[in-house]
């Protein structure tokens, strides 16, 4: 059992448990990116149509995040996480058994509901259970779990899918989720709902213009990211003419770069908050603009993926940190909105990438994403200049 003093003093074991859960959830959200071709082959569908499963998943998360958070706001958080994981596991088993694409989509919707609750509460929980004075590092560790999903989860999911079939990938995630659930139950202390906010928090949050601009910026930049990233596997295979192993390595490098992005965030984000965010968006836009030119040489494309992976991780962490600072009195509502809008961006980007792939060809996805990133950079500049005072709030 966990004593009250342990809960109050914080524990790295609890933070690690949440980071493991973050690894699982981010792996399953994006693992279809590496399996689009295989899933399309199983159901005799083009990758542009299969890729819409990313859009539907993301938009279910975006629509469900706030309502699910409000419905569960009074539930003790450890019990809530257990329920979330049980739904998550059952839905993955259904994914592995899916006999047609609609059934696969139904299972993904179940996973999306679990995702909606998980990410609405996890960042604030990591801050709560962290040792005193280590809240920023706790967020960094949570981000490491997210990064490892890109580094190991998605490439390993692709390797397993190619060797044993994509269904096995989903079954393996279900098995790993069972082990993670057991660790969560053992390591987390009782966590009563705290500062979750309510529906009455929404008008208050939307009266904070810096926070509203932050939310809009998130949608724009994440749309830019997923216009290209959603279709990076078919882009690598068809445009860059890379083989299966090289494509897996490309995904591995992209994810691995996120580790360096999280380190950069931990070291420089508080010292240079404005410049850090602007540099991240500029690097992202540059990476997307160079995607097609660098596809002529696989080694160039792999090197570019490192900059790309670092930049999107830096952006996501910077935005998450700002949400927690600007809405410290209603963290769960604010993070539910952030998670929902982040997934609006994912869904919009995946949908736009599908349209671009069909109308202009896969080769154009980077240029369209770069144009959106440029719009995001201009918005970030406006926000930094207009609301500089609000963004200089106290640290976590």
From Swiss-Prot:
InterPro entries: MFS (IPR011701), MFS_dom (IPR020846), MFS_Efflux_Transporters (IPR050189), MFS_trans_sf (IPR036259), Sugar_effux_transptr_put (IPR023495)
Localization annotation: Cell inner membrane
Coiled coil residues, start to end: none
GO cellular component, one term: plasma membrane
Membrane disposition: Multi-pass membrane protein
Principal location class: membrane
Alphabetical UniProt keywords: Cell inner membrane, Cell membrane, Membrane, Sugar transport, Transmembrane, Transmembrane helix, Transport
GO function terms (MF aspect): carbohydrate transmembrane transporter activity
Parts of the chain that traverse the membrane: 15-35, 50-70, 81-101, 103-123, 136-156, 165-185, 209-229, 246-266, 276-296, 298-318, 333-353, 362-382
Matching SUPFAM superfamilies: MFS general substrate transporter
Any Pfam family the entry gives: MFS_1
HAMAP family per UniProt: MFS_SotB (MF_00517)
Job description of the protein: Involved in the efflux of sugars. The physiological role may be the reduction of the intracellular concentration of toxic sugars or sugar metabolites.
Family classification: Belongs to the major facilitator superfamily. SotB (TC 2.A.1.2) family.
Name of the molecule in the record: Probable sugar efflux transporter
Lineage, broadest ranks: Bacteria, Pseudomonadati, Pseudomonadota, Gammaproteobacteria, Pseudomonadales
Gene: sotB
């Amino acid at each position: 059992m966990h004593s009250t003093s342990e809960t109050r003093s914080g524990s790295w074991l609890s933070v690690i448990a949440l980071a493991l859960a973050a690894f699982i959830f981010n792996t399953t959200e994006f693992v279809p990116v590496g399996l689009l071709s295989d899933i399309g082959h199983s159901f005799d569908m083009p990758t542009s149509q299969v890729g819409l499963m990313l859009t539907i998943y993301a938009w279910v998360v975006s629509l469900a995040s706030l309502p699910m958070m409000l419905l569960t706001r009074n539930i003790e958080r450890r019990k809530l996480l257990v329920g979330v994981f049980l739904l998550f596991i059952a839905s993955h088993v259904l994914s592995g058994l899916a006999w047609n694409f609609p059934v696969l989509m139904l299972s993904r919707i179940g996973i999306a509901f679990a995702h909606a609750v998980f990410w609405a509460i996890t960042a604030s929980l990591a801050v709560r259970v962290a040792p005193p004075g280590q809240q920023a590092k706790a967020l960094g560790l949570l981000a490491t779990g997210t990064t490892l999903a890109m580094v190991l989860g998605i490439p390993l999911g692709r390797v397993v899918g190619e060797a044993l079939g994509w269904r096995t990938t989903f079954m393996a995630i279900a098995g790993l989720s069972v082990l993670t659930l057991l660790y969560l139950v053992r390591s987390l202390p009782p966590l009563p709902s705290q500062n979750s906010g309510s529906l009455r928090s929404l008008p208050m949050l939307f009266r904070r213009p810096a926070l509203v601009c932050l939310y809009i910026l998130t949608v724009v930049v994440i749309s830019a990211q997923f216009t290209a990233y959603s279709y990076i596997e078919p882009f690598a295979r068809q445009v860059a003419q890379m083989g299966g192993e090289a494509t897996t390595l490309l995904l591995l490098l992209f994810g691995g770069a996120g580790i360096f992005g999280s380190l950069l965030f931990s070291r420089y984000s508080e010292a240079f908050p404005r410049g850090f965010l602007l540099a991240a968006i500029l690097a992202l836009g540059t990476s997307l603009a160079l995607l097609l030119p660098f596809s002529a040489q696989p080694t160039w494309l792999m090197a570019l993926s490192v900059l790309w992976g670092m930049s999107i991780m830096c952006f996501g962490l910077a935005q998450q940190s700002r949400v927690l600072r600007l809405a410290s009195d209603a963290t769960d509502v604010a993070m539910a909105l952030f998670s929902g809008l982040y997934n609006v961006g994912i869904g919009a980007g995946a949908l736009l990438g599908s349209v671009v792939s069909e109308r202009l060809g896969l080769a154009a996805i980077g240029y369209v994403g770069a144009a959106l990133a440029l719009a995001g950079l201009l918005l970030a500049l406006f926000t930094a200049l207009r609301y500089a005072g609000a963004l200089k709030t106290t640290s976590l």
